Amino acid sequence: MQNPTQTMHIYDMPLRVIAGLSTLAKTTEEDDNTSTGIVVSEVGEPQVVNHPAWIDPFVAYQLRAPRKNITPDFIFGRADIGNAFSAFLPRRFSAPAVGTRLVVDPVFTYQQRTVLGLYNYFHADFYYIVHVPAPLGTGIYLKIYAPEFDTTTVTRGIRFKPSASPTIALSVPWSNDLSTVETSVGRVGQSGGSIVIETIEDNSNETVNTPLSITVWCCMANIKATGYRHADTSAYNEKGMNFISVPVPKPPVPPTKPITGEEQADNEVTAEGGKLVQELVYDHSAIPVAPVVETQAEQPEVPVSLVATRKNDTGHLATKWYDFAKISLSNPANMNWTTLTIDPYNNVTLSRDGESMVLPWRRNVWTTGSKSIGYIRTMVAQINIPRPPQISGVLEVKDSINNSSISLVEFGGKVEIPIIPKVMNGLATTASLPRHRLNPWMRTAESKVELQYRIIAFNRTSDIADLNVSVLLRPGDSQFQLPMKPDNNVDTRHFELVEALMYHYDSLRIRGEEQSLPENAPNAVSNPQQFITPATALSAEEYNVHEALGETEELELDEFPVLVFKGNVPVDSVTSIPLDLATIYDFAWDGEQNAISQKFQRFAHLIPKSAGGFGPVIGNYTITANLPTGVAGRILHNCLPGDCVDLAVSRIFGLKSLLGVAGTAVSAIGGPLLNGLVNTAAPILSGAAHAIGGNVVGGLADAVIDIGSNLLTPKEKEQPSANSSAISGDIPISRFVEMLKYVKENYQDNPVFPTLLVEPQNFISNAMTALKTIPIEVFANMRNVKVERNLFDRTVVPTVKEATLADIVIPNHMYGYILRDFLQNKRAFQSGTKQNVYFQQFLTVLSQRNIRTHITLNDITSCSIDSESIANKIERVKHYLSTNSSGETTEEFSRTDTGLLPTTTRKIVLGESKRRTERYVAETVFPSVRQ
């Protein structure tokens, strides 16, 4: 019985050229070079070649007759590598002097070299594209052929005039007296895949800079190998494959009495089936070439039906090209790449008043793009190169800094290039958080894109030295989710500090495999007219909901509500209730053991059944407030998942309004139960509503009956006490996880559990007296999960602290977002305000911290502060960030001087009062503070 043959699929074709050369004919009908004498062929008419590494078919002259090669099938180990990892790689050569020859040897990619290194023998075919930029006055005449035996032997080939047709393609099939040769040795006298370029005549004008530059692309294709090379039977291991145990706490051992135990039998656990990998289908959105005047552009298609949908946020932006940068193109000294970074959130050039490019990024939390080419791309850059006839060349542009797709822009040509977000370019150095590789959404503030360019062909006359080219931008396929109220601008002098906090502390490196999901029909669409704030999305964010995993456990125990909070909360202030469900305490009883915590102890995996606008949903919360009849007011509430913890912290610190984030509900209580149509529930898209103590308003049923257009008259309305409505909403978790697998360290580095924010407002009594606090209770259930992998004989279990709420964990990659919110708030610079106190505490904690992956809310609020001004604290943190990598210690950082020279852009007078210094800083950031 023959050993089985295995198949490997290589997706996304690295280094594929997606915009080719206009001077390279695509069909034989287009090519009339032989009939007009531009090309003199000794090898017949050109043939059409299709290769996956080049977007279009092209015609190529066959320098050798193709043959059917034999691959010996009796030697152990064979591989049909084919065109996997093939790419057209450019090189530049100087044209040889008249009567001399240039031998161009073939090259192949690093990936091909790695795969071919597994075998001893191979054969392959080669393709060449030769391009000679021909500025005005070029008169060179070239001959190209495939060599034989030695450098003086000439074979049949082609002659062509670059001034009339600067680009020509060649096919060099395998030719050898042996069907395969040794990969690293070869055979004396073999032809190989090389070509020879000879200059026959050069009648170029004296103004043309010589020697002329010739660009040659080479592609090795149709590779077959035999003779497995490595007889290595060693076993290798990488950390990402292993079971990594949670550290087990060691109990103290009494010195006199050793602990003895009994032998226990091992119980084998049957592993559940893994997740199926299926190709996702992404639709390409229409980006108008010539948009209709005074008309919005069409909305881009979502990358996959499982992600949340929203209204068109870029309809007007997509009709205009925005100037971004000017680049200069001149004769390059080498083939190095130049990187152009575009930050659509912070860039000053894109932040002009009016219909600014940055606006959609600044008024939303999440953004994604289109997967029409196989991977996510967002913004579109246009490179349009005007040129005079005295200069000629080709610009090579990549849509990321990785080996992704390539566009070739001829001088005088134009190309539009969608660009890959930096955090999704596939490099381990850029995707630092799990959500960057597990979910297609990224935060708008981290949506930088990068493109790289280099000149691969360049010839000119002495009349001109370089070209200036404008890079234009459009939002392209960018789309957004989770709208917020607009933010204030941050002083540009603080950009580098915010950037450093976002990227300096972001040092996590987590490996894993991103898997795709089958497309499922989305849940019912919500009715946004019901809600006082925008809905988080018009449909559920289901990308990481895996319906095939787990089983539903029907226990009456799950129907018991868990009282997760009980107490007085201040009016007109945001109260945070962390819903760390794995360690939740039931305040209704001595609740270390409760329906929720017990589920985490019994199972390793808790899998959400459905999703809402924020992402996967595991249950619901319900808020109750038992107030006397003479008291009335309203309650704002929203539950923000762990990947939005910075949004929660900013509202706790009073930097942003709770009404400024989508999904916040306003519930009127006391007096008339419903004042007009104020919704009493957060937008519930998950279909998982299990309200406690009343009927949920704002769920899917309401979306169907459309309560917004079917209001009852006052006489028809029920009395408030007859059928009370529950103040309820979803409990979402971070969108990048498929299941809850609680490991405390992981959930501190990348929070998953949500924070419930509650803000009572305008509570007054019959005597029109304002209340300072009101008593509330918050119940929660976790009835929207399936279970998987039972656990027995556990040693490490989630710790539930008696009558204690969990602390809010702020991971290091969120520091920059919170700092930005402080810098946008003018009260943070006004002495005596709570925002100013929190700002000082936050900066102090940053300056005192050791190497940690997170801080907690309590670390900030319990931090003592001194009389040092905000301005000095900011400069101190800047100094710390700029010198920490060189080995500065915490003791060094506690110095009173910052080690910085005074700057002219910001006057910091240490001898003046703290109040005057901070007022100056506030006025420089917020001119409206001046009075």
Swiss-Prot record:
Origin: domain of life: Viruses
Keyword DNA damage listed: no
GO cellular component, one term: viral capsid
This protein's UniProt keywords: Capsid protein, Virion
Subcellular locations according to the entry: Virion
Transmembrane segments: none
Post-translational modification: Proteolytic processing of ORF4 polyprotein yields the VP4a, VP4b and VP4c capsid proteins.
Task performed by this protein: ORF4 polyprotein codes for VP4a, VP4b, and VP4c, three of the four proteins that self-assemble to form the icosahedral capsid. The capsid is made of VP3 (coded by ORF3), VP4a, VP4b and VP4c.
Designated name of the protein: ORF4 polyprotein
Organism: Nora virus
